[in-house]
């Protein structure tokens, strides 16, 4: 009887340990924003521990800030840059053209994109060796130094 009780206790402790480990790596997110020169940027980072797993950017650009007036001019101006983001595994990019602004949505899945592709992307800033992963703490520090503010939930 004592052996059965001891076995049950050990099993209970093991189950609790597994549950605590599983809860310890909970996925979280932080959002940062910046309005500058007619462009509103909202960046959302999804991370586990200190490792960023996904980043989503939404950039709203007024045509007047780009020195143009129409969505046709915007399409012509942004087409070449947008094409550089296409057909890369782990990356989705789209631009929606409105009457007075363009809204770009960019999503990077760091669990799928290669570090070589990541280094080639226009406008991507990073410090350190990206092949080892993206640090949430370093990303937050870099964003705040560029003027981004954290958006409280």
Curated annotation (Swiss-Prot):
Localization in the cell: Cell membrane
Pfam families assigned to the protein according to its UniProt record, in alphabetical order: DUF1307
Topology term for the membrane: Lipid-anchor
Signal sequence, renumbered to the chain: 1-22
Skewed-composition ranges (Basic and acidic residues): 135-153
Keyword Lipoprotein: yes
Keywords in alphabetical order: Cell membrane, Lipoprotein, Membrane, Palmitate, Signal
SUPFAM superfamilies documented for this protein: YehR-like
Positions of N-palmitoyl cysteine lipidation: 23
Gene3D superfamilies: YehR-like (3.30.1830.10)
Record lipid sites (S-diacylglycerol cysteine): 23
Top-level division of the source organism's lineage: Bacteria
Annotated family: To E.coli YehR.
Name of protein: Uncharacterized lipoprotein Lin0239
């Amino acid at each position: 009887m004592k052996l059965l009780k001891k076995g049950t206790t050990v099993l209970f402790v093991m189950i609790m340990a597994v549950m605590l480990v599983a809860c310890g790596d909970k996925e979280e997110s932080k959002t940062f924003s910046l309005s500058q020169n007619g462009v509103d940027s909202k960046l959302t980072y999804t991370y586990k521990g200190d490792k960023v797993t996904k980043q989503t950017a939404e950039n709203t650009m007024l045509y007047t800030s780009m020195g143009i007036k129409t969505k046709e001019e915007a399409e012509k101006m942004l087409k070449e840059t947008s094409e550089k983001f296409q057909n890369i595994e782990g990356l989705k990019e789209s631009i929606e053209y409105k009457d007075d602004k363009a809204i770009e949505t960019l999503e990077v899945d760091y669990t799928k994109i290669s570090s070589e592709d990541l280094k080639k992307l226009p406008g991507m800033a990073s410090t350190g060796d990206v092949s080892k992963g993206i640090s949430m703490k370093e990303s937050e520090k870099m964003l705040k130094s560029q003027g981004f503010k954290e958006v409280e939930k």
